[in-house]
């Protein structure tokens, strides 16, 4: 939901609410996915150059593929792969896809349609109500094989048929293709929050994806000014 993506509801609250309603055994997989979301945030914070390089690559690919038919067909759901077309429609109409479906979608985009993962990651962020920059970007990198070098995710016809109860048939996918290659590695960038400058501590800077102020250590502080760093909604399909 948009409440999750903007941090109005944080991950701890989600897990607590879920455990209050369902047993841990029924919740375990869901909790794992929530924790992965948190893990990816921390991972990217320590390696900010991954995000910088993604944006550079995205701009290059947008220029290169802007008018290419295969790209336009993909984002319009007009390919020869029925299940993919249905997922494009579902994503645009419901602003959501099941986690397993997101993996299939990304794999087909990268390895069967042969489109850049950066464009696929952007497409998700344009439409997912629960889109998170870290988990989305790194998830697409992982499917492509550049997040964990040499390890990629390939969607298969039998897997899609099994978990969609044979809803889709005759799914022609590229199921024998090596991972994408990236020789660049990213080291941890040490975070130094000891700023020697004399900063007015009566001001608060808030980002639009972390709005759970009631759960912070400074919820009772009296700030002179609160600054909100926000992306305009027209930059994303969040209404």
Question: Where are these predicted regions, by residue range?
Answer:
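C-terminal catalytic domain of photolyase/cryptochrome flavoproteins
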Residues: 1-99, 107, 111-239
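Short, solvent-exposed turn/loop segments enriched in Gly/Ser/Thr/Pro and often Arg
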Residues: 103
């Amino acid at each position: 939901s948009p409440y999750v993506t903007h941090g109005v509801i944080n991950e701890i609250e989600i897990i607590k609410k879920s455990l209050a309603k369902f047993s841990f055994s029924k919740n375990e997989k869901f909790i794992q996915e929530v924790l992965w979301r948190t893990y990816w945030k921390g991972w990217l914070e320590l390696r900010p150059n991954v995000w910088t390089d993604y944006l550079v690559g995205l701009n290059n690919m947008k220029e290169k593929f802007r008018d290419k038919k295969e790209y336009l067909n993909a984002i319009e759901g007009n390919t020869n792969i029925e299940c993919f077309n249905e997922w494009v429609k579902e994503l645009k109409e419901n602003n959501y896809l099941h986690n397993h479906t997101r993996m299939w979608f990304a794999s087909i985009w990268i390895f069967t349609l042969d489109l850049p993962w950066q464009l696929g990651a952007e497409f998700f962020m344009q439409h997912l109500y629960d889109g998170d920059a870290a988990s989305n970007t790194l998830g697409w990198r992982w499917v492509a094989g550049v997040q964990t070098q040499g390890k990629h995710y390939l969607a298969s016809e039998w897997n899609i048929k099994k978990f969609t109860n044979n809803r889709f048939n005759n799914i022609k996918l590229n199921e024998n293709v090596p991972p994408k290659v990236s020789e660049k590695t990213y080291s941890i960038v040490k975070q130094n929050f000891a700023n020697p400058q004399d900063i007015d501590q009566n001001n608060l800077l808030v980002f639009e994806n972390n709005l759970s102020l009631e759960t912070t250590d400074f919820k009772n502080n009296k700030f002179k000014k609160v600054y909100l760093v926000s992306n305009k909604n027209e930059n994303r399909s969040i209404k």
